[in-house]
Amino acid sequence: VIGGDECNINEHRFLALLYSERFQCGGTLINEEWVLTAAHCDMGNMYIYLGVHNVSVQYDDEQRRYPKKKYFCLSSRNYNQWDNDIMLIRLNRPVRNSAHIAPLSLPSGPPSVGSVCRVMGWGTITSPNETYPDVPHCANINILDYEVCRAAYAGLPATSRTLCAGILEGGKDSCRGDSGGPLICNGEIQGIVSWGGNICAQPREPGLYTKVFDYIDWIQSIIAGNTTVNCPP
């Protein structure tokens, strides 16, 4: 996260660190057995850490899991930059709530343009040169009109299941290594960090976030055991 500050240790109990030897992403615990992240975060030999703040410290209530099963949009195992960049992971066993671990609510409605939301992760805090922090950084950004992103990125369709979010004048943004992590509005997960400009936090180049509200039925169906459900068309 560019332009943010170290997150408060108590404000990210739902934040998961997805890690393999050469790759990291964020994720969000949405109940004791399920983590929501981005499809492009799929990696082999993935470990999922919960209850972590400083990655170089071992916490008493830290819990490590691995995926029992990963679910993608069946309508297309393919995702692209503006479609279906979402993955639901069933953990090999449930996690226990603790001082540093608790799930985040799914959205009760879509977010409105102008809302101030919070993005967080262990991604780089500088761009284009990368500097990875030991602790997650948090920044407040705005839900922007989708047209701002259409103006910034050639090829974005007229409508998509993504949110455009950032700061128009630049300076605050998610960045490399934050992928899959949450965009939180009013205590609910509204977005999943998906993609953005090659250099992060540039003016008029906001980030794009998978719009979680559009996938609620898909998420809830899979958790309920209906694994043949398709993503929204």
UniProtKB/Swiss-Prot annotation:
* Tissue-by-tissue expression: Expressed by the venom gland.
List the ranges annotated as motif Cell attachment site: 176-178
Q: List the disulfide bonds.
A: C7-C138, C25-C41, C73-C231, C117-C185, C149-C164, C175-C200
SUPFAM superfamilies reported in the protein's UniProt record:
Trypsin-like serine proteases (SSF50494)
Q: Name one Pfam family in it.
A: Trypsin
In Gene Ontology terms, what is one molecular function of this protein?
Answer: toxin activity
Q: Which Gene3D superfamilies match?
A: Trypsin-like serine proteases (2.40.10.10)
Which keywords has UniProt assigned to this entry? Disulfide bond, Fibrinogenolytic toxin, Fibrinolytic toxin, Glycoprotein, Hemostasis impairing toxin, Hydrolase, Protease, Secreted, Serine protease, Toxin
Q: Which GO terms describe its cellular component?
A: extracellular region; secretory granule
Q: Where is the active site?
A: H40, D85, S179
Residues bearing attached sugar chains per UniProt: N54, N129, N226
The effect of pH on activity is described as: Optimum pH is from 5.5 to 8.5.
Q: What biological processes does GO assign it?
A: proteolysis
* Primary residence: secreted
Q: How is its activity regulated?
A: The fibrinolytic activity is completely inhibited by PMSF, diisopropylfluorophosphate (DFP), pefabloc, dithiothreitol (DTT) and Zn(2+), but not by Pepstatin A, E64, iodoacetate, chymostatin, tosyl-Lphenylalanine chloromethyl ketone (TPCK), soybean trypsin inhibitor (SBTI), phosphoramidon, Ca(2+), Co(2+), Cu(2+), Fe(2+), Mg(2+), Mn(2+), K(+), and Na(+).
Q: Which ranges carry the Peptidase S1 domain?
A: 1-224
Residues under site feature: Cleavage: R77, N78
CDD domains referenced in this protein's UniProt entry, alphabetically: Tryp_SPc
Instruction: Tell me the first and last residues of the signal peptide.
Output: none
Which InterPro entries has this protein been placed in? Peptidase_S1_PA, Peptidase_S1_PA_chymotrypsin, Peptidase_S1A, Trypsin_dom, TRYPSIN_HIS, TRYPSIN_SER
| Enzyme Commission identifier(s) | 3.4.21.-
Look up the further comments and give them: Is devoid of fibrinogen clotting and caseinolytic activities.
* Family statement drawn from the similarity comment of this UniProt entry: Belongs to the peptidase S1 family. Snake venom subfamily.
- Assembly, per entry: Heterodimer of the brevinase A chain and the brevinase B chain.
Record function comment: Snake venom serine protease that has fibrinogenolytic activities. Preferentially cleaves the Bbeta-chain (FGB) and more slowly the Aa-chain (FGA) of fibrinogen, but does not affect the gamma-chain. Also has fibrinolytic activity. May play a role in antithrombotic reaction as well as thrombolytic reaction.
Q: What is this protein called?
A: Beta-fibrinogenase brevinase
Q: Which organism is it from?
A: Gloydius blomhoffii (Mamushi)
